């Protein structure tokens, strides 16, 4: 039976609950325990799949096809445990489930209320898989006091009461602001946050104090006294140069020991942190630097491409090289020649995205990389842009484009070398889609197998002829253009097992030019960099040595 750790936040949002949860999971693993991490989001969207990246950041896709919060990416990267659909839930999903049950008559005519029906649905979610691991770490999105979060706080209060004593603990992350006028760290916001938490029946066992300055011992004692928490369980959470320092930093501050003490686990197994020492060694002792241009649509918010940024960092670790990723808005290249902006870079990456805005700029970035011999990695839409560029400029399909960008019914602007995917094989059955389907949850989502051409560059990178990668797309390159494009040098080196869906393209006579329909960044880890990103950075290093 799993022990439960509930991680909550107070004072302000975006303090790093997700990273704290991931780091704690990694520390418990380092002591030999098995863990699973979950995220409970109070927003009313069913999932983040239809939310704007500017609103929410990236959507992290699991192997089983769930569209989830980017925090699940942190969970996977820090623990190596693949997330599942049952590891993410929102108020929208909870209320949807409750209403479906009401329509079916499952509640036998009772009046449906937040307590007990909504809270019971949340508790049912928490119980899934509780016999599989030693620790279940559950992060509650938002901050204590948010009106949307009240059912979740009530549910975890009830859940802790339902379990035997000592089976659940609460970790609360707050902010210690520094007031420069007085030269002091202020504890009142933390005290009031804990007071709010206690008013709804939850008493924190461990406090994490986010601070940009060293926390004096007297301030820790004061917080421990007024918040009714043991002083050893008042843990500093300082700003760090890199997120991958978090496990070692939290261990130095005693977070994992405080959690084990709260559960009464004594003597505690000693941690083996060699993995994280090696990660930090590779980051801090990089032997060079490469510049990678990320030409995208959502460049104003780096969280929109969070996993890509982290995967590039991992690729740098694999090569003991520092990767300096720089964001360029693709719309710039629709007005300007890309050459002056891109000539100082050692590699170019075009990430996934939706909609027509900026696509001509991405096509020009792909053309620049192809013609100048600069390493190019196109992901999802980035692969489609590379194919359209090759179709226009090599295969002489001058009006090549995507069905996604033909908005007017009956009026075609493009020859669609990229089309709306209406049918594909998933497992042992066929999935069918129509143009007028709902937007949410209707893409080709989750892990699918791809067959690689023996002897191709990608088969050498993967050291395999069959791979499994995660997808999130509803448009696909039309295989009918394969012969024409391969005749011009763009090889279809990865296909779906049935041979109908192109998964990877590459240019053989180019230093490094690869487009993939899937999202390799979602499977990269600091201690296990994704092979595509590792080799992409290696190619960038080679270019940097020629400059």
Swiss-Prot record:
Broadest EC class assigned to this enzyme: ligase
Pfam family, one: CTP_synth_N
Record GO terms (molecular function): ATP binding; CTP synthase activity; glutaminase activity; identical protein binding; metal ion binding
Pathway: Pyrimidine metabolism; CTP biosynthesis via de novo pathway; CTP from UDP: step 2/2
Keyword Nucleotide-binding: yes
Binding-site residues, L-glutamine: 353, 381-384, 404, 474
GO BP terms in the entry: 'de novo' CTP biosynthetic process; pyrimidine nucleobase biosynthetic process
Superkingdom of the source species: Bacteria
Record region (Amidoligase domain): 1-265
Keywords: ATP-binding, Glutamine amidotransferase, Ligase, Magnesium, Metal-binding, Nucleotide-binding, Pyrimidine biosynthesis
Disulfide bridge positions per record: none
List of catalytic residues: 380, 519, 521
Residues involved in CTP binding: 13, 146-148, 186-191, 222
InterPro entries in the record: Class_I_gatase-like, CTP_synthase, CTP_synthase_N, GATASE, GATase1_CTP_Synthase, P-loop_NTPase
Binding locations of ATP: 14-19, 71
Subunit architecture: Homotetramer.
HAMAP family for this protein: PyrG
Family note: Belongs to the CTP synthase family.
Protein name: CTP synthase
Organism: Cereibacter sphaeroides (strain ATCC 17029 / ATH 2.4.9)
Gene name for this UniProt entry: pyrG
């Amino acid at each position: 039976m799993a022990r439960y750790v509930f991680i909550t936040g107070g004072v302000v949002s975006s303090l790093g609950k997700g990273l704290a949860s991931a780091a704690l999971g990694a520390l418990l693993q380092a002591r030999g325990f098995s863990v699973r991490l979950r995220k409970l989001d109070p927003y009313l969207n069913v999932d983040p799949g239809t939310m704007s990246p500017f609103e929410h950041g990236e959507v992290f896709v699991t192997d089983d096809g769930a569209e989830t919060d980017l925090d699940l990416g942190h969970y996977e990267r820090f623990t190596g445990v693949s997330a599942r659909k049952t590891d993410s839930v929102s108020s929208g999903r909870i209320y949807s489930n409750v209403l479906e049950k009401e329509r079916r008559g499952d509640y036998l005519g009772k009046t449906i209320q937040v307590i007990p029906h909504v809270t019971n649905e949340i508790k049912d979610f928490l119980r899934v898989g509780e016999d599989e691991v030693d620790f279940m770490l559950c992060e509650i999105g938002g901050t204590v006091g948010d009106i949307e979060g009240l059912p979740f706080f009530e549910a975890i209060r009830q859940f802790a009461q339902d379990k035997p004593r000592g089976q659940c603990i609460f970790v609360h992350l707050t902010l210690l602001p520094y007031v420069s006028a007085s030269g002091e760290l202020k504890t009142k916001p933390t005290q009031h946050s804990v007071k709010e938490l206690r008013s709804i029946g939850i008493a924190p066992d461990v406090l994490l104090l986010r601070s940009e300055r060293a926390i004096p011992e007297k301030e820790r004692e004061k917080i421990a006294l007024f918040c009714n928490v043991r002083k050893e369980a008042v843990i500093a959470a300082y700003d760090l140069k890199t997120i991958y320092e978090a496990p070692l930093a939290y261990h130095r501050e005693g977070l994992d020991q405080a959690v084990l003490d709260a559960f009464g686990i004594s003597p505690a197994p000693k941690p083996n942190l060699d993995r994280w020492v090696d990660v930090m060694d590779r980051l801090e002792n990089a032997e060079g630097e490469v510049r990678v241009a990320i030409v995208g649509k959502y460049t104003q918010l780096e969280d929109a491409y969070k996993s890509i940024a982290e995967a590039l960092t991992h690729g740098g670790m694999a090569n003991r090289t520092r990767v300096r990723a720089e964001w360029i808005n693709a719309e710039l290249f629709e007005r300007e020649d890309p050459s002056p902006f891109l000539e100082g870079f050692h590699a170019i990456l075009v990430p996934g995205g939706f909609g027509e805005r900026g696509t001509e700029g991405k096509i020009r970035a792909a053309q620049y990389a192809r013609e100048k011999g600069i390493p190019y990695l196109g992901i999802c839409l980035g692969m489609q842009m590379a194919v359209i560029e090759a179709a226009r400029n090599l295969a002489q399909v001058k009006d090549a484009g995507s069905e996604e960008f033909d908005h007017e019914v009956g009026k075609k602007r493009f020859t669609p070398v990229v089309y709306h995917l209406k049918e594909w094989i998933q497992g042992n059955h066929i999935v069918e889609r129509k143009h007028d389907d709902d937007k949410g949850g209707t893409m080709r989502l989750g892990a699918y197998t791809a067959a690689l051409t023996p002897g191709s560059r990608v088969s050498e990178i993967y050291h395999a002829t069959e791979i499994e990668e995660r997808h999130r797309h509803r448009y696909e390159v039309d295989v009918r253009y394969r012969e024409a494009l391969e005749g011009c040098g763009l090889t279809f080196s990865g296909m779906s097992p049935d041979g109908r869906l192109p998964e990877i393209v590459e240019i053989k006579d180019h230093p490094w030019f690869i487009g993939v329909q899937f999202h390799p960044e979602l499977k990269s880890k600091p201690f296990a960099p994704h092979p595509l990103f590792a080799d992409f950075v290696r190619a960038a290093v080679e270019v940097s040595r020629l400059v």
